[in-house]
Amino acid sequence: YYFPNSKLFAANINPFQLKYFSKRIREFYVDVSSKKTMRNLAEYLDEYFDVIIDDASHNLSDILYALPIFFKKLKKGGYYIIEDIDQFKVFKNLNPKNEKLTPIMILKNLEKNQKFDSNYISNDEIEYLKKNIKDYYFEKGEMILNDHNISDIVFLKKNV
């Protein structure tokens, strides 16, 4: 099997999908639409991670809530990966408040050191991300729907 020396942590809103039986996998029932619940999970976890993959609900608010909370749980030099980063552009129900600031726009603002406001990320969290994201890059997906690539992935590297 892959990564035989690794430990895996999985968080899911659907308790019926939490069905892995392995000493290497710890599972948590979590509502990622609740910033408080995600903060509680981050505080509960006494681990820091080499890789964190956000392949959760694809709701824009959930992606933006999770990023600053769980990016802090990365080891130095670790990677935070967000899958299907633009699905909310096609599926409007994934952005019910019609938030204009997308994860890609946030990364570009951070890179250019431009000030911005977010309904989901506090100013303190923005400053933390500015100081701690070393680099990011995109991997183009192949799933196109209504002229939008909905399967792009972004990789964020934490400072060493």
Model-derived segments and spans:
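S-adenosylmethionine/decaboxylated-SAM
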Residues: 1-160
